[in-house]
Amino acid sequence: MLIFVSTLIIKMITIQNNKLKATFSELGAELTSLINLETGKEIMWEGNPDFWGGQSPVLFPTVGALKNEQYIFEGKTYELPRHGFARRRVFDIKNSSENEVIFELKSDEESLKIYPFEFSLEIKYTLVENKLTVSYRVKNLSDKEMYFSLGAHPGFAIDTENGMNYNDYEIAFSDDEKLEIHPLVNNLISNDTQTIELDNKTLPLSYELFSKDALVMTTMKSRELILRNNKNNHKVIFTFFNFPYLFKSFLTFDLIFKKVLTKINL
């Protein structure tokens, strides 16, 4: 499938096994569809631009916003947009098979103007039975320290048919948690915190919960979350490793997983 965006031709690629069918865009190496072949149910948020046009953007080389969208490195001021630039760049398809695809984005003349580091970002998507695994590899292609953040921002569809609504969903945590939430102030994370107590390791969803924007959690122990409907068996199990910070926002249901590495040399 081809999609025309301005003067660019964006290629879509699909991988599939006997359980799942996943579709990706070269633009941002973004997962745009994940279908349960047994039920025909679409798992991903549709990307309605009236609410949120994204579906599963990759956040690199920053997660969230910088103050005034600027930072200083080696005495020079650079401008970097919210969530970085990877989601707006066309990735190369490095390799693909029936059930796996590897995307790659490399630094170039344009990226060096706003992010003065030579890098390679590889994202591998693999279908294994009823699981989609995603792995990331960032390479520093120079001999100087490279600063970056890396985040995943998948949005999952909420079933509102057959009398279901947003309040019928909850998040189950793998560990006992006392969640410390950092509020967002002018799109920046505040040092202030508030505590949310879980009920039997679960957090019921409500629009009120997200009335002040996303929830930012920096001390969470759980490495598995389950988004589930408490009236039926519909659920999405999300496991993640080496991503210490969690953001949750209210549009349908989306997660931002953030990994911060101060330097990497490979």
Language-model segments: what does each one mean?
Residues 8, 62-64, 84-89, 116-120, ...:
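Short solvent-exposed loop/turn micro-motifs enriched in small/polar/acidic residues
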Residues 10-70, 77-81, 222-241:
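Beta-strand-rich N-terminal accessory domains
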Residues 24, 75, 134-138:
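Buried hydrophobic-core signal for structured, non-transmembrane domains
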Residues 77-129:
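Extended, loop-rich substrate-binding clefts of extracytoplasmic carbohydrate-active enzymes
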Residues 107-154, 159-160:
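Acidic, contiguous internal or C-terminal segments within carbohydrate-active enzymes
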Residues 158-243:
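Active-site/ligand-binding surface loops and adjacent short beta/alpha elements
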Residues 234-266:
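Active-site pocket scaffolds in enzymes
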